[in-house]
């Protein structure tokens, strides 16, 4: 957050670079969520298929995605190794994610290896790596369903956890 001011104060050499493309500081949970949603927003001029724009990332070798016959995927990105049998809308689905039949993913980011069990619902959330959202569990909520708007924020399920339905 204070890298540039701290470098300036320490007398470090700073160099400016003119940049005209898309850039977003993802230093908060909300801004990380927004940046991912920008990738699927048709009103944001980002062309992921522009071969002159290099994307540097770790890509594990996995089979292609599998979209089940009853699955619904709308305005989302689903990467390799995913098995989608539920409903995915306006979401970013990382490699190796499983969305079981009857599960709903809305306006969310699922990190690599996440599993969403049948009947579970994920809304306005970031689900960490290798996290399991249990059968009929729910995480997150649409902002319009929250009475106290000041308390609403993107929900987070940290990596390597298992969320169960409230009994």
Model-predicted segments: where are they?
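Left-handed beta-helix
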Residues: 1-164
